[in-house]
Amino acid sequence: MAEIIGIDLGTTNSCVAVMEGGKVRVIENAEGSRTTPSIVAYTKDGEVLVGASAKRQAVTNADRTLYAIKRLIGRRFDDNVVQKDIKMVPYKIIKADNGDAWVEVKDKEGKSQKLAPPQISAQVLIKMKKTAEDYLGHEVKDAVITVPAYFNDSQRQATKDAGKIAGLNVKRIINEPTAAALAYGMDKKKGDRKIAVYDLGGGTFDISIIEIAEVDGEHQFEVLATNGDTFLGGEDFDLRLIDYLAGEFKKDEGVDLHNDPLALQRLKEAAEKAKIELSSSQQTDVNLPYITADASGPKHLNIRLTRAKLESLVEDLVERTIEPCKVAIKDAGLKVSEIDDVILVGGQTRMPKVQEAVKNFFGKEARKDVNPDEAVAIGAAIQGAVLSGEVKDVLLLDVTPLSLGIETLGGVMTKLIEKNTTIPTKANQVFSTADDNQTAVTVHVLQGEREMASANKSLGRFDLSDIPPAPRGVPQIEVTFDIDANGILHVSAKDKATGKEQSIVIKASSGLSDEEVEKMVKDAEAHRDSDRKFHELVDARNQADAMIHAAEKSVKDLGSEVSADEKSAIEKAVNELKEAMKGNDKDAIEAKTKALTEHSSKLAERVYAKKGGAAGAPPGGEAEGEPQAQAGGKKEDVVDAEFEEVKDEKKKDEDK
């Protein structure tokens, strides 16, 4: 069976891994990094940039550079957390027709295009898919994608949609802390252990209590409880620092940088860099020359920042992570002292203040043998290997993070499945009508812990009609909730008297319709085709440039030996090629390049002969001859060096 890759689709960074020959390999991207910034940029030329290239141009293209999109996935525009984010990001968050939070960017014609968060996240997944394909040498179709444990049903569904848009068959959605536990526990076979996975990433916080046990020779990972906050992460730490720096600058210079998207983007980059530096040093300088200007001239920002100051700015954010830890321990039915190991996941856990808070709560140092940036992708790859059958002795028992139920008489939520129930699971309950002769009931599906229905997350609603008229309380309506292994909910309602049944797979009451997802899949495929054509055009231009350089160099080297006719023909061919390069017609550029090659090939041979090519080139002659060899089309003389990558595992064996 083909490999199933593991993807950690993160708020700030993403990572991809695959299991090969029993070992998990985290795959480097085209830039040589093991993690890729989860940033997507739409340039003024219509190109889509993903990762480091998108991050590099963020300052000059702030309103089209989209980051932390995971915080919007599966969210309503009117959510308080979304409203808070709108004020802090340089790009435009809008209300979609279905009430979701979407993003608006300008296309290359300057027209507004509306993008759904799954559509943007799909671009990051396409990059991860391509990274894996480049390494494996063949197409990849199947993937396991991770989500925060505390993601609700609509956020999970939106993540699955993103995978589909990216051309991936999402075999499983698994929780990030569970994946990290797999990465940690796979090679630890002795005895039962209870571990706490504290996952503070770029945009979300999760805590999971997991028991690792040996059961009948199987390595069993059972999630006992999970809790968290899907709008608390490193981005919030950055925002505190940005606000502080902007406030200090306003005090000194009287200018509010929040009103300047360009300055705000530079400030964001500087704040992130300063935060990282303060994890290893006690103080740092934030120095941004020419950050803005007013009538009196340019303004420069130069502020000294200490670790103590940063810690005071984010103290309450660190404290906010402790309450979910208390709830998770209580829900797991354990005491803090019964936790054997604490695993830290997510880049923000590198902050000493966070590590100190974790140590104070759990009464022990966290493990340092898990890479916080890579553990989740490694765990996803292990789960992929379990699903493909490559790994056979692992059983993963995950849970649903929030209770699920329906709205009943008086606006009350009646729970059918309690939080922290092991999935997959199924539950049913019989309800009845509230009025005499009622012929239809509306099943309103809810997710959350509050008694009042309106205070919980609405996942969707559907009607069961054609109920035979009867006094209230007589009809028997059986409602069944079925959660699959991805944590996605299927609900059905059945009239026991008539056998009539109505069911839905819960998509968020917002969410993308199947038609919208299919359209986005086609758009993404079309974009991949246009990207391929763009790269082919760039290659053609590069070859044309090299040909022009080689031809002009040949004319210069031969000097008076070039006849007027030859010179005129080459100049004409060069000018025609330069004209073709101004356009976007790849075929025209290639045709003119070929014409110039034919004109200049004889000159190239004469240059080579003149420099001693015929009588044996002097030292250095080969290097000088390279462009001419190209120009003359003598490719058979140039042999590409063949090499193969030595895999880490082989290398280790050789070193022994």
From Swiss-Prot:
One of its GO terms (biological process) is chaperone cofactor-dependent protein refolding. GO terms for molecular function: ATP binding; ATP hydrolysis activity; ATP-dependent protein folding chaperone; heat shock protein binding; protein folding chaperone; unfolded protein binding. Residues 607-656 are annotated as: Disordered. It comes from Coxiella burnetii (strain RSA 493 / Nine Mile phase I). Residues 647-656 have a biased composition (Basic and acidic residues). Its main location: cytoplasm. This is Chaperone protein DnaK. It is found in: Cytoplasm; Cell membrane. Induction: By heat shock and acidic conditions.
